[in-house]
Curated annotation (Swiss-Prot):
Residue stretches making up the Septin-type G domain: 22-296
Protein name: Septin-1
Gene this protein is translated from: SEPTIN1
Region listing for G4 motif, in residue ranges: 170-173
Domain of life: Eukaryota
Membrane-spanning parts: none
Major subcellular location class: cytoplasm
Swiss-Prot/TrEMBL keywords: Cell cycle, Cell division, Cytoplasm, Cytoskeleton, GTP-binding, Nucleotide-binding, Phosphoprotein
Region: G3 motif, residue numbers: 89-92
Classification lineage: Eukaryota, Metazoa, Chordata, Craniata, Vertebrata
Residues the record lists as Phosphothreonine modifications: T251
Length: 367
């Protein structure tokens, strides 16, 4: 006798429809010194223009410019799939003469997103929690140096336990192929020597197809990604126009894997590992932050220290303890009390109607 069909095989279709209807969100941070092509690469990756209204300051103004945090959002739809992309930019990073502690606003911003999510998650109304946590940080490294600079090391040390780091060599068309490989090897050695954790690719399952395993191996070998960005379409005598940069010695094609790692970076960010970046952010980075917060609250005198650190904010490495203001807490309690009172009144009315209907039914039976 054949086994009867129950219908559990349709569960993936249910999840797919629900996910497509809800849409996806992804927050990407870009950091690194100015002039490395960060804005151009973002526009190239997502085929959009996020920075059309940006005003570039004069060189003299950059000497005293302080780092700011800018958020830009765009909704991208492709094949019926909607993605709400938020790009967090850090203009002014490393531009001033004195770069001491210039990474602290970035650390503070990342922790504030964790703090806000923990507040929302710990609140009474958790139906529509907005996830503004940073899921990935593209850190741009100059192609003109000999590896990581002291500023690069200091920044990466400060954030490597708070966000998924993907190192990127900007404007890689300034390097010869041998120079690119030498710089990549130097950066990998420095990251290992400084014990800086970057995003680790998950191991492929044994049942994955060979093409996926090959692409995954190529992406792992490409780190740090040497990239070139361009939104211009150029012709180089080929059968079709390509996006790239035209020089006197030839043309650099953005989407040519022999010229740069742009395709591997886009494949990793969008096609293969976007969901894993979000899961690592939630399951490892955010849970680590949450555990540290709870441990701090459990220690004697933690609330007094929390209130003092909240006022001072002297160090961005201090763990902010997410406590709702008293007025907000009382307001939420009053709202829930009112909601419970209304539900109790509705229940009493329903019980009264049921008793009345029952009494009327008994009278009808007696007649």
């Amino acid at each position: 006798m054949d086994k009867e069909y129950v219908g559990f095989a349709a569960l993936p279709n249910q999840l797919h429809r629900k996910s497509v209807k809800k849409g996806f969100d992804f927050t990407l941070m870009v950091a690194g010194e100015s002039g490395l092509g960060k804005s151009t690469l973002i526009n190239s990756l997502f085929l959009t223009n996020l920075y059309e209204d940006r005003q570039i300051p004069e060189a003299s103004a950059r000497l005293t410019q302080t780092l700011t945090i800018e958020r830009r959002g765009v909704e991208i739809e492709e094949g019926g799939i909607k993605v709400k992309l938020t790009v967090v930019d850090t203009p002014g990073f490393g531009d001033s003469v004195d770069c001491s502690d210039c990474w602290l606003p970035v650390v503070r911003f990342i922790e504030e997103q964790f703090e806000q999510y923990l507040r929302d998650e710990s609140g009474l109304n958790r139906k529509n929690i907005q996830d503004s946590r940073v899921h990935c940080c593209l850190y741009f490294i100059s192609p003109f140096g000999r590896g990581l600079r002291p500023l690069d090391v200091a920044f990466l040390r400060a954030v490597h336990e708070k966000v998924n780091i993907i190192p990127v060599i900007g404007k890689a068309d300034a390097l010869m192929p041998k120079e690119t490989q030498a710089l990549k090897q130097k950066i990998r050695e420095q990251l290992k020597e400084e014990e800086i954790n970057i995003y680790q690719f998950p191991e492929c399952d044994s049942d994955e197809d060979e093409d996926f395993k090959r692409q995954d191996a190529e992406m792992k070998e490409s780190i740090p990604f040497a990239v070139v960005g361009s939104c211009e379409v150029v012709r180089d005598g080929g059968p079709r126009p390509v996006r790239g940069r035209h020089y006197s010695w030839g043309t650099v094609e953005v989407e040519n894997p022999h010229h740069c790692d742009f395709l591997n970076l886009r494949r990793m960010l969008v096609q293969t590992h976007l969901q894993d970046l979000k899961e690592v952010t939630h399951d490892l980075l955010y849970e680590g932050y949450r555990a540290r917060c709870l441990q701090s609250l459990a220690r004697p005198g933690a609330r007094d220290r929390a209130s003092r650190s909240k006022l001072s904010r002297q160090s961005a490495t201090e763990i902010p303890l997410p406590m709702l203001p008293l007025a907000d807490t009382e307001k939420l309690i009053r709202e829930k009390d009112e909601e419970l009172r209304r539900m109790q009144e509705m229940l009493e009315k329903m019980q009264a109607q049921m008793q009345l209907s029952q009494a009327q039914g008994e009278q009808s039976d007696a007649l």
